[in-house]
């Protein structure tokens, strides 16, 4: 089974994955194959209160419209979201292989669309 692994420690919130996916699937306004979710802002950890440093976290979440770009991956290409990720924090492959990349040092999310 294949999936997409996202190291959201490094996601910059650029929305490139959303745009590439939306264009490929031809989805109307308000529908997504991958949706960027923002959490924050909150004060930066370890800073004195009121110093003005804030942190955001961005997490791309695959939706039920995602088919892992089956037509592309069958030809050996990457899913559009992975190919267009500007931060290079998205990976496509076998779930077992992707799970081995998760080192416990950063924040990871492993998505397996269609898995039950």
Q: What role is predicted for each listed range?
A:
Residues 1-116:
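Non-ligating segments of multi-cofactor redox enzymes
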């Amino acid at each position: 089974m294949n999936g997409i692994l996202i190291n959201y420690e490094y996601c910059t919130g650029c929305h490139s994955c959303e745009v590439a996916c939306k264009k490929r699937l031809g989805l109307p306004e308000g529908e997504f194959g991958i949706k960027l979710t923002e959490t924050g802002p909150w004060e930066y950890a370890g800073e004195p209160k009121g110093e003005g440093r804030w942190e955001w976290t961005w997490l791309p979440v695959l939706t039920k419209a995602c088919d892992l770009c089956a037509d592309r991956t069958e030809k050996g290409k990457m899913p559009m979201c992975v190919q267009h990720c500007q931060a290079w924090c998205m990976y496509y492959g076998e779930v077992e292989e992707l799970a081995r990349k998760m080192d416990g040092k950063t924040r990871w999310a492993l998505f397996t669309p269609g898995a039950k």
